[in-house]
């Protein structure tokens, strides 16, 4: 369910050494399954463990997850990254905003999941987003761009070289991707 790298485990172990004996960590999602979902990690003293929690045992510690957060933390990864600027803890939870869909789910749901969990987080860096409007009987995914993508001069490259390539690779049943956005360039546009 959750991967905690050795570097992150070592970091947590150092922090936990200064806490009450038996304290572990809790990984959680606030507003799971919504666009405002946020993940977090906190200390979990022994008296804060609930009977409904899932305990994930790692080499150096245990992580507790409340039952509501469990499905939204599938495939999550916690790492401790060090570079020239310093060190930071990273928590990637691709399913926090939208629960992972089954491979047998309808094509529309599977495409929507990929857009929300993989494409939109990349577009969000530019204040943009994309929404699946429909999948035509001919197998075309009809998308609408919003935010910083609306009116952006790079939207065609993003559509063809990024989104379309990724969707066609993941979903061979799709024949292409089309943009139905009426682009209006303005201050909101990224480029």
Curated annotation (Swiss-Prot):
SUPFAM superfamilies from the entry?
A: Fe-S cluster assembly (FSCA) domain-like (SSF117916), HesB-like domain (SSF89360)
Q: How is the cofactor bound?
A: Binds 1 [4Fe-4S] cluster per subunit. The cluster is presumably bound at the interface of two monomers.
Q: What Pfam families does the record tag this protein with?
A: Fe-S_biosyn (PF01521), NifU (PF01106)
Co-factor requirement: [4Fe-4S] cluster
UniProt keywords, alphabetically: 4Fe-4S, Iron, Iron-sulfur, Metal-binding
What residues does [4Fe-4S] cluster bind to?
Answer: 149, 152
Does the record bear Cell wall biogenesis/degradation in its keywords? no
Supply one GO BP term.
Answer: protein maturation
Q: Which domain of life is it from?
A: Bacteria
**GO terms for MF:** 4 iron, 4 sulfur cluster binding; iron ion binding
Does the record's keyword annotation contain 4Fe-4S?
A: yes
Q: Show the HAMAP family listed in the entry.
A: Fe_S_biogen_NfuA
**The family this protein is said to belong to:** Belongs to the NfuA family.
Query: What functional role does this protein have?
Result: Involved in iron-sulfur cluster biogenesis. Binds a 4Fe-4S cluster, can transfer this cluster to apoproteins, and thereby intervenes in the maturation of Fe/S proteins. Could also act as a scaffold/chaperone for damaged Fe/S proteins.
Subunit details: Homodimer.
The name this protein goes by in its record? Fe/S biogenesis protein NfuA
Q: Which gene encodes it?
A: nfuA
């Amino acid at each position: 369910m959750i991967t905690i790298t050795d570097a992150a485990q070592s970091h947590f172990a150092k922090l936990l050494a200064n806490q009450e004996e038996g304290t572990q960590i809790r990984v959680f999602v606030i507003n799971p399954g919504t666009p405002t979902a946020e993940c977090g990690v906190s200390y979990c003293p022994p008296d804060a463990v609930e009977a409904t929690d899932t305990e994930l045992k790692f080499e150096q510690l245990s992580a507790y997850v409340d039952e509501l957060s469990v499905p939204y933390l599938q495939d999550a990864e916690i790492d401790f990254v060090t570079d020239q600027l310093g060190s930071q803890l990273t928590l990637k939870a691709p399913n926090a905003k939208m629960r992972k869909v089954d491979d047998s789910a309808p094509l529309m749901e599977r495409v929507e999941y990929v857009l929300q969990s993989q494409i939109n987080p990349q577009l969000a860096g530019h204040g943009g987003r994309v929404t699946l409007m429909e999948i035509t009987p001919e197998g075309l995914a009809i998308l609408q761009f919003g935010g910083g993508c609306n009116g952006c001069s790079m939207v065609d490259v993003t559509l063809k070289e990024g989104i379309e390539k990724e969707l066609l690779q993941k979903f061979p049943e799709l024949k292409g991707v089309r943009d139905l956005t009426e682009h209006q360039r303005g201050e909101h546009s990224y480029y």
